[in-house]
Amino acid sequence: LDMMTGGPVPTQAVFEGSDLDLDTLQELCTMFDSMSGESKCYDDISGEELPTKLVNEARETEMGWVRDIGLYDKVQRAVAQTSGIKPLPVMWVDVNKGDKEAYNVRSRLVGKELKAKTKETLLAHQLFSAMPPWEAVKTLLSLLVTDGVDGAGTSPEEELEMAIFDISRAHFMPKCKRELYIELPPEDRNPGDGDLVGRLNRNMYGFRDAANGWSEDWQATLSGVGFKVGVANPALFHRGSDNTRGAVHGDDF
């Protein structure tokens, strides 16, 4: 127990002097929690303990979103087996966006897809998501402050504005292009369900092509309303009809 309390060093896959792997140790920790009558939750970034009640509420909020967008359909495990596709495990990532005085717990349901399992099936371009250069942001700021200056591409009567948009749960937006199955989270299992798994309808955090899928999704959306996406860098976009320019960094516009 002292060894488990100390924990492994970050580069080790097992505890020093122990034949137990991390999966086995995780099962033991879960067992100890159940024996004590408590289920403890921890911040996946800081490692600090989080109030279980707040974590459960955050997870239920996330599950509400998952159900609303139809992230997956419940199907019999035999469907996945017939397709020859193994359902992938999922996990919760819990983070306190606030502090100990004012908690703001967020939970995200993520898949656990490993590189070793997909290196033969996913090509490099399917894993790539472009990022804008810092110079692009400086250019946008320069255009903003030269509003109405001759040669800047604007007229005196134009009022340029800059806005920043953060897209929540961006990786859930695109439709899933691959046939994928996941193990159902405990929060979505009901008595009498039987041996069900989830067949994904949309992309999901934790899958290796999720970022690329999101990029293709927003690019198609903007192209549909008159924007041109950059050729040298597809993280940039422009619409000449109203002189709108922008850059995308991940899920931030």
Task: Say what each PLM segment does.
Residues L1-A220, G224-V231, L236:
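Chromodomain-type histone methyl-lysine reader module
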